[in-house]
Amino acid sequence: MAEHPRQLQDPAHQPRSHQVVKAATAATAGGSLLVPSGLILAGTVIALTLATPLFVIFSPVLVPAVITVSLIIMGFLASGGFGVAAVTVLSWIYRYVTGRHPPGADQLDHARMKLASKAREMKDRAEQFGQQHVTGSQGS
């Protein structure tokens, strides 16, 4: 099957009947969508008119209930998140201790070596300072 190249026509060069069909289709689609949107708007206004007095009457009960339910849900979500975090951390520690080299182990080892070298350096400085202080007090 040979494909025929489609000619792209400028809308100004399209036949008048094609433009009329496009306009009629657009008007029909727009009109048919306008009716349900109007009905939905009217239904929303009626529902709000009926529900607003009920919300005002029951708000002393509803507001604390909503706050309580929200706090309970947030508590469950937070405890679940903390549980997942704890399992993740314990899994990482287990892999690190067993030598499976989890992500970030190199950084941890580098930081530990750097901290140990700084501790040794501070220990040496303290010993030097102590010796200088002892020799300085003996010479006086």
Curated annotation (Swiss-Prot):
GO biological process, one term: sexual reproduction
Protein topology in the membrane: Multi-pass membrane protein
Pfam families for this protein: Oleosin
Matching PROSITE patterns: OLEOSINS (PS00811)
Record's subcellular location: Lipid droplet; Membrane
Alphabetic keyword roster: Allergen, Lipid droplet, Membrane, Transmembrane, Transmembrane helix
Tissue note: Expressed in seeds.
Annotated transmembrane regions: 31-51, 75-95
A single cellular component GO annotation: extracellular region
Origin superkingdom: Eukaryota
Family: Belongs to the oleosin family.
Function: May have a structural role to stabilize the lipid body during desiccation of the seed by preventing coalescence of the oil. Probably interacts with both lipid and phospholipid moieties of lipid bodies. May also provide recognition signals for specific lipase anchorage in lipolysis during seedling growth.
Protein name as annotated: Oleosin Cor a 13
Organism: Corylus avellana (European hazel)
